[in-house]
Amino acid sequence: TVQHTPYYNVSEELQPIQPVYLDGVVLPASLTGNWFVSIAGGTSAFLGTPLGCEDLFGRLKPSYSFAVGKWFTPSVGARINYSGVQFKDGTLSNQDYHHIHADLLWNVLGCRYARQEQVRWNLAPFAGVGLLHNASNGNNPFTVSYGVQGEYRISKRVSAMLELSGTTTFQDFDGYGRPNRLGDHMVSLTAGFTFHLGKVGWKRAVDATSYIRQNEWLVD
């Protein structure tokens, strides 16, 4: 009977193992991890129905926004956003408004976290629903929000942010136009900062194969 004795290189088996990461796999976020707060300011233009006679630049008014949200994965997040100040209606009169909406964000660059620990750029289209309050006439219509947000990470806790967003609601939001028919729009361009709270970042999943092999050798 011929017996084969497996050969192990002892020095090789006892060497510290360098981690090998699974391609495209990150660990899920904890409940307290990857929260964020965003503060931004810029300008907005109201494009209502009826439109009125002014061009786009004549409709611009200052605006600001404040958002709180969380990233659940490197690609998927959600936020609650508040914005407001004033807009020019179809007669070019100033009206006060407040807008709150919940958005789903999709970071199209999130896949990079599966290949490296730190990613500086985020590009996230978003869409959501909310409510507009016209403080001048009391209207509170349902809204659809949408846009795209870009971020550049300055440090672990702070990112610079630029956002182009839009809102669509019913034509009579400003007191003019037909009720129960979509046709009033708000377009905004804002810039500001995002502050990252809690545990920040994502852990890449480690391939355990080499650790299992070493453990089996030690047991044998």
Q: What is each stretch, according to the model?
A:
Residues 33, 58-64, 96-100, 119-121, ...:
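Residues that define the transmembrane beta-barrel architecture of outer-membrane proteins
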Residues 39-43, 66-70, 102-108, 127-131, ...:
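Residues on the lipid-exposed face of transmembrane beta-strands in outer-membrane beta-barrel proteins
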Residues 24-34, 75, 109-122, 154-157, ...:
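Short loop/turn motifs that connect adjacent beta-strands in outer-membrane beta-barrel proteins
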Residues 90-92, 97, 155-220:
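Predominantly the C-terminal beta-signal and adjacent terminal strand-loop region
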Residues 36-38, 77-79, 122-126, 159-161, ...:
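Residue-level detector of the transmembrane beta-barrel scaffold of outer-membrane proteins
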Residues 49-55, 59, 90-95, 116-117, ...:
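Outer-membrane beta-barrel translocator domains and adjoining extracellular loop/strand segments
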Residues 74-143:
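Gram-negative (and chloroplast) outer-membrane scaffold detector with strong preference
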Residues 1-67:
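Short glycine/proline- and aromatic-enriched beta-strand/turn motifs that initiate or cap beta-hairpins
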